[in-house]
């Protein structure tokens, strides 16, 4: 997107004829139209590849549905949390919601792929764990919930037996981002879809962002529309529910994000961001809601955005330092997310030497429209019943 005022040559190159006295706003709109046209053409060229990819995924699912490819069902309660699309739908805070709901009644374990970790195979998190070893999201679980058994494994089917062998007292396993891992049949399948880009209005890769076709939603037991705006109306929720078209056995819920109390990365002391000037360092798929929140909360915000799950290199650290030091303003801090903090912490010696305040902003999930009790009861009922059967089985 170009924000400078274009001249006639620039417009001619874009195939537009506009008088020199036209407004900058009109030029910006014209440039947007050109970019949208280019994007549409490129996307259209990707459509044949989407058909091929979609056919492969469809065949894979049919093989599982027909029993040709086998799925393993474990006696221990297994809850899968995943999505149909690539990118951030908010799986991590929903996993944390389930941890907080279950951890005081049951021994909880999580199993993630450990995306972008520098290791392979099954790993049980211990005191040697860091984001490089187990991935940023599992490291976040490990740091926040010491009573939870945190594990990573690319292959859930072989990883779960190893997890249970290492921690036989586990009552329930939460599978992170496992909706497409059909080699394991979960007892409860939770599908999360983003409010801004629900699966029913999206298309399969690479034409759209779906990992598999829209009809795959039928495998879910619970469907959560995530990142809903605080002022979302019941009418809008009902409209989206109609578009989802849930099956008889499916329940649909809506969730929003609540930002929790910020704290210092090293001292863990609580911090108030109001009236502070913020350098936001984030590596998340959709940072816009976070930026919007900070612009409302803080005095001013400077954004440094990196790719999702990005590991900070020396040049990135220098960019953060220079941005902070060169911002000629007082009462300033660096703010990051909990997930990004696990990777920033790998550079803790350098960060401490700077003397720059690094503030972590946690987020929590909230179930909307007073449906939290219904959601909680559904989860607890399944786990309680399945865990009881698991305990009875282990006695014999």
Each language-model region and where it sits:
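ATP-dependent carboxylate-amine ligase
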Residues: 24, 30-36, 184-191, 195-396
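Walker A (P-loop) phosphate-binding motif
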Residues: 62-127, 230, 396
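A transmembrane-helix-recognition feature enriched in membrane-embedded lipid enzymes
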Residues: 29-74, 371, 382, 390, ...
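Phosphate/Mg2+-binding loops and adjacent switch elements
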Residues: 114-248
């Amino acid at each position: 997107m170009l924000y400078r005022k274009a001249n006639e040559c620039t417009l001619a190159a874009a195939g537009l004829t506009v008088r020199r006295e036209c407004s900058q706003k009109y030029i910006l709109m014209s440039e947007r139209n050109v970019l949208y046209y280019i994007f549409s053409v490129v996307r259209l060229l990707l459509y044949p590849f989407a058909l091929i990819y979609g056919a492969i995924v469809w065949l894979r699912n049919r093989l599982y549905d027909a029993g040709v490819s086998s799925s393993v069902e474990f006696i221990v309660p297994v809850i899968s949390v995943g999505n149909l699309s690539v990118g951030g739908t908010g799986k991590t805070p929903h996993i944390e919601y389930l941890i907080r709901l279950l951890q005081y009644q049951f021994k909880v374990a999580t199993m993630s792929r450990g995306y972008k970790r520098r290791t392979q195979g099954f790993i049980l998190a211990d005191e040697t764990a860091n984001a490089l070893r187990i991935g940023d999201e599992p490291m976040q679980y490990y740091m926040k919930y010491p009573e939870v058994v945190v594990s990573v494994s690319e292959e859930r089917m072989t990883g779960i037996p190893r997890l249970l062998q290492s921690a036989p007292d586990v009552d329930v396993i939460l599978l992170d981002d496992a909706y497409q891992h059909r080699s394991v049949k979960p007892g409860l399948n939770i599908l999360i879809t983003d409010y801004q880009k629900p699966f029913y209005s999206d298309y399969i890769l690479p034409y759209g962002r779906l990992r598999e076709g829209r009809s795959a939603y039928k495998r879910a037991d619970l469907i959560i529309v995530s990142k809903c705006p605080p002022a979302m109306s019941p009418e809008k929720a009902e409209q989206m529910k109609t578009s989802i078209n849930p099956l008889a056995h499916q329940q649909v819920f809506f969730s929003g994000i609540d930002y929790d109390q910020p704290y210092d990365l090293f001292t863990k002391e609580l911090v108030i961001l109001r009236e502070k000037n913020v350098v936001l360092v984030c590596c998340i798929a959709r940072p816009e809601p976070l930026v919007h929140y900070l612009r409302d909360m803080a005095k001013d915000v400077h954004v440094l955005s990196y790719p999702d799950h990005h590991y900070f290199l020396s040049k990135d650290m220098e960019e953060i330092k220079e941005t902070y030091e060169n911002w000629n303003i007082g009462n300033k801090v660096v703010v990051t997310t909990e997930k990004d903090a696990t990777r920033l912490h790998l550079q803790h010696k350098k960060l401490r030497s700077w003397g720059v305040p690094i503030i972590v902003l946690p987020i929590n999930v909230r179930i909307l429209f007073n449906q939290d009790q219904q959601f909680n009861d559904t989860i607890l009922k399944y786990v309680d019943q399945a865990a009881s059967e698991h305990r009875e089985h282990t006695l014999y």
